[in-house]
Amino acid sequence: MLEEFNLFLLISDKSLIAYHLDVVTAGPTSTVDSSRKAPQKLSGSRDVGFFVAGRMKDRTLVFYKKRDNLSSTFKVLEPIYQKSSERKRAGYFKRGSTEFFREFDDFYIPTECTGINLFTSSLAVSTARGFEVLSLERKVPQSVPEVQGESVQNIVRHIKDQRALCMLRLSEAEFLLCYANCAVYVNKHGEISRSVIMEFVGTAQTAALSGAYLVLFDTDFIEIRNAQNGRLKQIIAGREIKCLDDGGEYNAGLNRPPVPAGNGSVYGSSAAGGRTVKAVMQHPENERTQIVVELLLNDEMKEG
């Protein structure tokens, strides 16, 4: 959801569609002008694998991956409608000759990709062979982590066949590479910064940061660890669990502001930032019902 531009994005029938929030939230007696606020198809037909949105260098951008076979082509779009605050002052949404989005850029990764994390001036792509970091200016992928050096070979062997999930920023100088069964620490140059491997209890399908904590989503439980030292803090049991909202800006885990943590600043999200992590799971008693849970930090759990 791009509240700043009064837009809601979703994938429908493998196509990326943009809707006005006024249309999505309209009540039965609403007088929304549907002709002026019709949804816009942002991609081709049935060719979108996934999309993310976030801010890079003060621009709001939307990235989507085309459904290629053994390679990945990414399209980058920029919304150009006037902001919702301007729309409210005007009292209506001026369309004029502009469109919802303009084509901003594109790039190619010669392998299958499963996710993107955006940072201030660069992005990390999760691929079938690990992580690739690049900027839109140069578009020269750098494989992360750096695997040279005898001292890191144990870690390199451990992550060799692991499925790459996401790259999360812990501080200005350190990042966490999250895989399905473990995580490793790297510095801003992509070099392994600690000799430890954070082993998970389960097999994570998704990973997110919430304040000082790493939240991991297995299909049968949610695993919560201290992001700085890897200590297990909590297990939340369930069935058919999926992450709905990772708490990051634009629901994509991107560009998180620094949040004070018990043992340093962690670039995550928290209720203080207005966003929280949310998940959906099977209702424990009613097979035909699912429940949505919101993860909130218990004050007694905070680490001093």
Feature-to-residue mapping (PLM):
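Eukaryotic assembly scaffold/adaptor repeat-domain signature, activating on surface loops/turns
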Residues: 1-194, 201-231, 240-304
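Extended acidic/polar alpha-helical scaffold segments
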Residues: 234-235
